[in-house]
Amino acid sequence: MNHNDFFKLIAADGLRGAYLLQGEEEFVKASALKAAEKLIPEDFRAFNMSVLYEPDADALTEACETLPLFGDRRLVVCNGLASGLDYPRLADYIQKMPESSILLINIKGAADSKNSLVKRLRSEGRAVEFDELPLSDIIKWCMKTANKQGAVLDSDTARTFAGLVGTDMTAISNELQKLIDTVGPGGTITRDIISRCTVGSIEFQVFAMIDCFTAGKVRDGMRALHGLLEDRDAALGIASFLESRFKLMLEGRKLMDGGLSADCCRKA
């Protein structure tokens, strides 16, 4: 099941039983958890919602076995799975959970495919994949979010914005909110405002810096480099980015030494 199907299930009030939430897109995953939380009336969440962090099997089953109070259902959010859990036992338990309980197992990143509980949920179509969003979805999300807050953002400008910030939705959300706050209700987000207010991804900033040097704009290139190095997190990001590039160069060199042409190496 993809994240869109899961959101539709929430909107249709169709959540029943246990679900596994996994994948690299943590922002969308968190949004799904917030949407599911709204299934429980706010006044009764203290009674009918439990949030657990790497619980043992007894704590997890106890939370699921607790009957709802002043309502007809209970939401249990399990953040992470502790090592050493009796997974076969839990895999069997989710088959006989009370119908009043909804269990959401929230895994950061990818879940262990060898885990018997994960296998069971996948086999039953209860594993929700939160993969990196395609650019088209990011553009639509940006336009919709801006519109909800009274700002105007067209698709071409949204594409420029996404190209600058990258595909991490947490960064997208933070930077977009800055733009919305800058233009205010009824304002229009333009490329000029984006260029003045948005912090681009490390990859984008590095390539922009290199473009300055290759175009002979040494002063602009040095200014961009110093700007990056002044930010400790950016400096670490540059190191990580360059490391990944060097690894690709080394892999390409090995392939060429093995007899592959440069064109074949680019496609590999």
Report each predicted region and the residues it spans:
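Conserved beta/loop motifs at nucleotide-recognition and modification sites
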Residues: 1-268
